[in-house]
A protein has these predicted regions:
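Short beta-strand scaffold segments in enzyme catalytic cores
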Residues: 102-106, 173-177, 242-246, 287-291, ...
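Aspartyl protease catalytic domain
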Residues: 107, 116-271, 275
Length: 324
């Protein structure tokens, strides 16, 4: 596939939102720095709280109308503006939507999440896990956010005691990964990661916090690009977008929308139940998501990038989901 134009960062100051108190992510110690180890000790996160069942063939709360093993082909039966209708997809994955907008929901009691460093972003050596994920127990995966070079993402990357692209930025929206395999989405509270945090991927500001949409989500105006990133067409802020969030009961929700504004992505995440959420990637086939079963990847929409990169070796950071 041909080379894609480089991403352009939003303009303006980095976010400075207050920390969220849902879980213990950072400590009050000083800023983390490149290739440094974290030492502060704090309590384990309270959200999400993972209780690992011995066997979970279908997630709690699924509205299963028949056998379903593949992600594509579902129709969102909920009227516009109402909560999404969920279905059982691949084992331990709930899904909703179709080819223009879809969401996947994961219960941290049934699955675990892993952050991976890419061979080029963040690059370098010594990162745990490698840039090609194991297929043992693999369920799904998605790619990270904006390029972290030149402050495009308003933040940094932390994994296995080391950071890249400067210290983690206070207030920046962050995927936070814990030792127990759970994850959270929150505004980084500042300081070094606590000892129960194994990974952090930062990107822009929260789109949703405390169940409320961010005040600077403008429906298709130029202000959107200054905050949420420039699209392929400078005259139109609509593009392919992905995001990640958490529900009030700790489930993790991934969503992707086709040719949509930042507000439309945030509204879709909100309909999926997210009370905190952040944008991940935008434009072209940069948003990547797939489910893994029977030795192969399945992408739910043709405008997504190939998820096979996650097991063959990916140049940029990504997240994988495994069965517990």
């Amino acid at each position: 596939m041909g080379a894609e134009p480089a991403e352009k960062a939003p303009v303006g100051a980095s976010p400075t939102g207050a920390s969220h108190t849902s879980g213990s992510a950072g400590s009050s110690g000083g800023s983390s720095s490149g290739a440094s180890s974290s030492t502060p000790s704090t309590s384990a996160p309270t959200t999400p709280s993972a209780t690992v069942p011995s066997h979970v063939p279908v997630l709690p709360g699924s509205s299963v109308t028949g056998p379903a093993t593949k992600l594509p082909g579902y129709t969102d039966s909920a009227p516009a503006g109402e909560p999404l209708a969920w279905h059982a997809g691949s084992p331990r994955v709930e899904v909703s939507g179709g080819v223009d907008a879809f969401a996947a929901r994961f219960d941290p009691g049934a699955v675990r999440f892993e952050l991976h460093a890419g061979s080029q972003v963040p690059g370098g050596s010594g990162w745990p896990g490698g840039n090609a994920a194991s297929t043992s127990g693999l369920l799904a995966g998605w790619n990270g956010g904006f390029l972290m070079a030149n402050n495009a993402s308003w933040g940094g990357f932390y994994l296995g005691g080391h950071t890249a692209f400067g210290p983690l930025r206070t207030g920046t929206a962050s995927e936070v990964f814990y030792k127990d395999g759970s994850m959270d989405v929150l505004a980084w509270p500042g300081g070094l990661p606590s000892t129960d945090v194994v990974g952090v991927r930062q990107n822009l500001a929260l789109m949703i916090d405390d169940g409320k949409l961010a005040a600077d989500l403008n429906d298709g105006t130029a202000a959107d690009e200054r905050t949420w990133g420039f699209t392929n067409n400078s005259a139109d802020v609509h593009g392919n977008r992905s995001g990640i969030g958490v529900t009030v009961d700790g489930k993790v929700v991934y969503a992707a929308v086709h040719n949509a504004s930042p507000l439309q992505l945030a509204q879709y995440l909100q309909r999926a139940g997210a009370v905190r959420a952040m944008q991940l990637d935008i434009n072209f086939t940069r948003p990547i998501f797939g489910t893994y079963a029977d030795g192969r990847w399945t992408e739910p929409a043709p405008w997504l990038g190939p998820a096979g990169r996650f097991t063959s070796g990916n140049e940029r950071d990504f997240v994988t989901v495994y069965t517990r």
